[in-house]
């Protein structure tokens, strides 16, 4: 799952109107944001294996911290709790906590059986990445519904608010399409550096959301 995580962050704005889109993006993308850091540190590993699934050539054989259900549940509780302590905003704390752990459940839908329940534990996955039609349909549906919900719930204050969010989502969409049509990456380091670039979504989302407001507020 890639663009679907962004769609969920957009939709979560309805659950927590006072929480910045940047924070919601950080939550739903948390696993993929820390993953490249662990790759570069040699804590987790991935290998290029063309043909392992139809939609991605990557073999996610070792990511027990960033992508196990137990680890993400712990991070969900800690970060969601910290958010509440700093803001006293219950809805926002729930949105952050659920956003973090949601990553695992969305990835299970797409991945083959490589999503660990806990570090070293059983791995599961429905495997929609083995079907171009089903995989693309689920990604686009989740992404599109999220965009519609965010657009229906918020309105721009100015030109930045009118274009910045959609600029970010357009970038994300093109990155996803590029990953589908380009050849396999040469090595793990290139994968990690490319994944690190998605950190830009967090400040971009915060900036864009500052220029929008809740409809009817």
Placement of each model-derived feature along the sequence:
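N-terminal membrane-targeting hydrophobic helices
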Residues: 1-217
């Amino acid at each position: 799952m890639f663009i679907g995580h962004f769609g969920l962050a957009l939709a979560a704005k309805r659950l927590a109107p006072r929480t910045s889109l940047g924070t919601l993006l950080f939550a739903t993308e948390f696993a993929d944001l820390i993953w490249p850091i662990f790759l570069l540190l040699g804590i987790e590993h991935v290998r290029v294996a063309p043909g392992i699934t139809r939609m991605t050539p990557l073999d996610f054989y070792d990511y027990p911290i960033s992508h196990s259900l137990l680890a993400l549940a712990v991070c969900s509780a800690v970060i969601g709790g910290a958010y509440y302590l700093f803001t006293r905003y219950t809805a926002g704390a729930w949105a952050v906590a659920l956003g973090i752990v949601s990553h695992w459940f969305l990835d299970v839908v797409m991945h083959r059986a490589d999503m660990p329940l806990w570090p070293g534990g059983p791995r599961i996955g429905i495997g929609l990445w083995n079907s171009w039609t089903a995989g693309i349909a689920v990604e686009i549906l989740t992404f599109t519904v999220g965009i519609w919900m965010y657009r229906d719930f918020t309105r721009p204050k100015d030109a930045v608010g009118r274009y910045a969010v959609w600029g970010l989502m357009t970038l994300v969409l093109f990155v996803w399409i590029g990953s589908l049509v380009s050849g396999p990456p040469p090595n793990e380091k290139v994968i990690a550096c490319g994944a690190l670039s998605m950190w830009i979504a967090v400040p971009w989302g915060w900036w864009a959301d500052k220029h929008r407001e809740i409809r009817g507020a």
